[in-house]
A protein has these predicted regions:
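M16 family metallopeptidases and their MPP-like homologs
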Residues: 1, 70-103, 107-159, 170-178
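Proteolytic maturation boundary segments
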Residues: 1-89
Length: 178
């Protein structure tokens, strides 16, 4: 496993590089954000086998982990300093987030039942955990169709700061899970 210092060194190494947008295999990911409609993956780092760190052109940092299960799933985990992304039992916040995230994607405004159906059809699930000023947001999506996951996760995260301890424990947890 990489130490927090090693991850920091990797971040510094990539910080000043101008790289071509990383194209997810078989799919060109254009992430829809109101302020930045062309947000794209700007750099890719392999942290471990089946574990990849992506930096988006809008500043968000994302970890991708392919599951080892029979049906390949993509775990998309982001660290954001945008505050609490907690969702009440009725999931109004999640519905509002989904409505924003998928606007312009053909999904349109979603009712609670429509959101459940959209999530089921696209095999997307979402959870969040708050730690201090950071929010860990985890989305599970199909490996062969990751875009709905990015649509759901990307709206709130326009800039991210990495808390070294959270990043390290998150990375270790992902490696343990693999």
């Amino acid at each position: 496993a990489l130490s927090p210092a090693a991850i920091l060194a990797l971040e510094k190494e990539y910080a000043n590089k101008k790289l071509a947008a990383y194209i997810f295999p078989g799919r060109n990911l254009s992430l829809t954000v109101d302020a930045d409609p062309q947000a794209e993956i700007s750099s890719k780092e392999t942290l471990a086998e089946n574990l990849t760190s992506l930096t988006l052109s809008n500043g968000a940092r994302v970890i991708l982990a392919k599951s080892a299960g029979e049906e390949q799933k993509l775990q998309i985990t982001a660290v954001s300093n945008k505050g609490d992304l907690s969702f009440p039992a009725q999931q109004k916040s999640l519905i509002a987030l989904a409505n924003k995230a998928v606007s312009g994607s053909g999904v349109g405004e979603l009712s609670s039942s429509s959101l459940k159906r959209w999530s089921a059809e696209n095999s997307v699930t979402m959870s969040s955990k708050v730690s201090g000023m950071n929010t860990l947001l985890s989305v599970s999506a199909r490996t062969n169709n990751p875009e709905p996951g990015f649509q759901l996760i990307n709206q709130r995260i326009t800039h991210s700061t990495i808390n070294d301890n959270i990043w390290a424990s998150l990375q270790n947890a992902q490696i343990q899970a693999l």
